[in-house]
UniProtKB/Swiss-Prot annotation:
It holds the Pfam family EamA. Belongs to the EamA transporter family. The chain crosses the membrane at residues 9-29, 53-73, 105-125, 126-146, 154-174, 179-199, 210-230, 240-260, 273-293, 296-316. GO terms for cellular component: membrane; plasma membrane. It is found in: Cell membrane. Keywords: Cell membrane, Membrane, Repeat, Transmembrane, Transmembrane helix, Transport. The lineage of its organism: Bacteria, Bacillati, Cyanobacteriota, Cyanophyceae, Synechococcales. Its main location: membrane. Residues 103-169, 191-316 form the EamA domain. It is a multi-pass membrane protein. Signal peptide: none annotated. This is Uncharacterized transporter sll1319. It comes from the Bacteria. InterPro entries: EamA_dom. It comes from Synechocystis sp. (strain ATCC 27184 / PCC 6803 / Kazusa).
Amino acid sequence: MRILSNVNLMGLLIVLLAAIFFCFHNVIVRILYSQQNILGIWQVGGFVTPTLSHSFLLLLLRMLWVVPLMALISQRLYGNTWREINQLKQPVNRPVIWEAMGCGFLMFLYLVLLYISISFIPTGIAITLFFTYPIFTALLAWRLFNDVPSLLRWLVIGLTLIGTFLTIPYAYGGEQQTLVLGVSTGIASGIVYAGYTVFAQRSFQRLHPVPFTWISFATTLILSILCLIIWQPHEGNLPWLAITIGSLLSALFTLAGHVLNNWGIHLIGASRAAIIGATNPALTVVLAGLAIQESLTNIQIFGVCLVTFSIALLNYEKVSPSTGKNSLK
């Protein structure tokens, strides 16, 4: 059995830490929407009600932190960030900036849908539904680029659909409408994110991921402002200090997750990092259970594990045929 090198092991741990940071962000969003029992000790949360305008508000406050912080560290992540952004002003590069801004719109849309989903259903379930996106990515790639799914990929799609079905909560009475909304927006966020990944991958051929990501964040910020002008929250007395702190923590965990994930990709490659990243639904369930005592049924836990296994298997298929090519230099 081959022993992992120090670089490989470090890369795996870094990507795993990035996934944990993303899980913290998901739990924080849940706390902002509904009161939770933190570590079984004290009650906190429920600062905003689960409405469309509040989703815009939370996304706006998050991006108000993320955009300037990303601008500060972007030069360290990629030395030509601002030079490439300035070059986008040239008429010949207009299609590139429009592509990046279009992906920014998709980022805005999938984040709003995911926020709505988390506000209505348990965090782990919302993230599991979101992580069905590789199914739609495979179907989009088949439709747009004639990338016919392999037999293994069809098997993964089937397992993911079964896991998703097992994960969906069922209730009766007044909760049914909110559950339907939470489940549908969770799946919809995955569909939109699939489109984002497909078009982003195409944009990376002409624009580096770091300036591309900053443009997407900035576009999301602008769209959040515009939507908040149209759909203003009706409540005039919100706990702004708590919301601001929660948004700052959300931004820091998000940004740290992105930076660590990119670092891990540099060490072990994107495909291997994606296999570790596929554990996000299971990690979110564990973290939500420990931090806010969020519980799922045994069938739902099995569904989460099945989706996690399926996505990891799909990512393994991508790395397996080219293991030799992707070996570290």
